[in-house]
Structures are given as structure tokens and as C-alpha cells.
């Protein structure tokens, strides 16, 4: 099983919808600054041994975050969804609106 972590801002999630069942943990604010609470919230909800897929708008930010977890924390089960939520929209994936 995989845990999907939507790292986009609330505004981005509200605009496009989310993957049903995904966890919503904003990693960067609208200015691109890392949100300090992200790590605590992440650690409360996810174990470093879990299979995790980070989701961003187009996949770049989630890829950087996943690589950071692997390189800095040795968490080998961290992944990024290539193309991000925009790829799912192109494929007419059924996103849930909050």
C-alpha cells in the first residue's frame, strides 16, 4: 500500500481537487518557503518505512522533496508522482473537490 501525500497549498488543492484518500500536508507556502510544520505533521502521520508518493502541481517540487527524504533521512520508499496533479487532470482522473 502507498500513502499519497499532497504537498500543494490549500488554494492549489481547492482549485483542482485532490486524489481521494490522500493526506494533505502543505510543504511550501505560496512564496516557495518550506513550511516548518510540515515535518512534524508528516512524522505524526507517516512512518519513514511507509511507501510514500508525494504529489505536487507538476511533479518537480514533489521530486525534490522525495529525493531529500532519501538523501537526508535514508528513507528509501519515498517517491514522486511524475507530472503531478496536472498529469492526472490531463488523464481525466476523478479528483475529489473539498
Predicted regions and their residues:
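Structural scaffold elements adjacent to functional motifs in cytosolic proteins
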Residues: 4-6
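Short, surface-exposed ligand- or partner-binding patches at beta-edge/loop junctions that are enriched
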Residues: 54-56
Amino acid at each position: 500500500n502507498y500513502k499519497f501525500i499532497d504537498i500543494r497549498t490549500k488554494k492549489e488543492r481547492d482549485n483542482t481537487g485532490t486524489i481521494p484518500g490522500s493526506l494533505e500536508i502543505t510543504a511550501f507556502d505560496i512564496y516557495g518557503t518550506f513550511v516548518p510544520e510540515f515535518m512534524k505533521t508528516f512524522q505524526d502521520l507517516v512512518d519513514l518505512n511507509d511507501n510514500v508518493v508525494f504529489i505536487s502541481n507538476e511533479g518537480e517540487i514533489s521530486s525534490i522533496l522525495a529525493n531529500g527524504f532519501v538523501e537526508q533521512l535514508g528513507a528509501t520508499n519515498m517517491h514522486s508522482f511524475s507530472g503531478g496533479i496536472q498529469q492526472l487532470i490531463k488523464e481525466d482522473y476523478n479528483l475529489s473537490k473539498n
